[in-house]
UniProtKB/Swiss-Prot annotation:
One of its GO terms (molecular function) is imidazoleglycerol-phosphate synthase activity. The active site is at C77 (nucleophile), H178, E180. Heterodimer of HisH and HisF. Keywords: Amino-acid biosynthesis, Cytoplasm, Glutamine amidotransferase, Histidine biosynthesis, Hydrolase, Lyase. Signal peptide: none annotated. Coiled coil: none annotated. It comes from Buchnera aphidicola subsp. Baizongia pistaciae (strain Bp). GO terms for biological process: L-histidine biosynthetic process. Transmembrane segments: none annotated. IGPS catalyzes the conversion of PRFAR and glutamine to IGP, AICAR and glutamate. The HisH subunit catalyzes the hydrolysis of glutamine to glutamate and ammonia as part of the synthesis of IGP and AICAR. The resulting ammonia molecule is channeled to the active site of HisF. This is Imidazole glycerol phosphate synthase subunit HisH. GO terms for cellular component: cytoplasm.
Amino acid sequence: MSIVIINTGCANLSSLKYAIQRLGYNVIITSNHKNILNAKKVFLPGVGTAFSAMKMLNQFKLKDVLYKYQQPVLGICLGMQLLCSFSSENNGIKMLDIIHAPVNILKSNKFPLPHNGWNNVSVCDENPLFIGIKNNSKFYFLHSYALYENDYMIAKTFYNVYFSAAVRKENFFGVQFHPEKSGLVGLQLLKNFLEI
């Protein structure tokens, strides 16, 4: 089974690659269209800014590849946000518009930004991503922007306000947290995705 991590040019991909390999899968990091379209599963990671990530996706013409891809895709952190309509970052960034909802800065009030550390994830809807994972398990987060509650939300987290911790639309899944940095529950989630 070919597993692909899309090289978004703005993420530390080694921890994700290592986590997938620990589960017994071969994985490649690439932006090659053919490799992506022939993969059984695709990961869309991201750390940093929506602007730089979308610039890279446009530069390598990966938007159309993702629109054509029919197998499961998992967006992680910024990768989940890239699936959305737009981000309020930098006066507005158009994104992939697969999840028809905007990404906005977290309304943190007295809570510091970025939201950095472990937080509980409450599952809203039965979903294959969370099989074998206790509700309200802790996952590792690092972000300042968030997708608020919406029709595609399958799990949520509270950090001054509730926001989407995980979303799904058809073959596209997204998680705001980093499963590859979330210990055994994170590995279980990655395993669940790889077995869909």
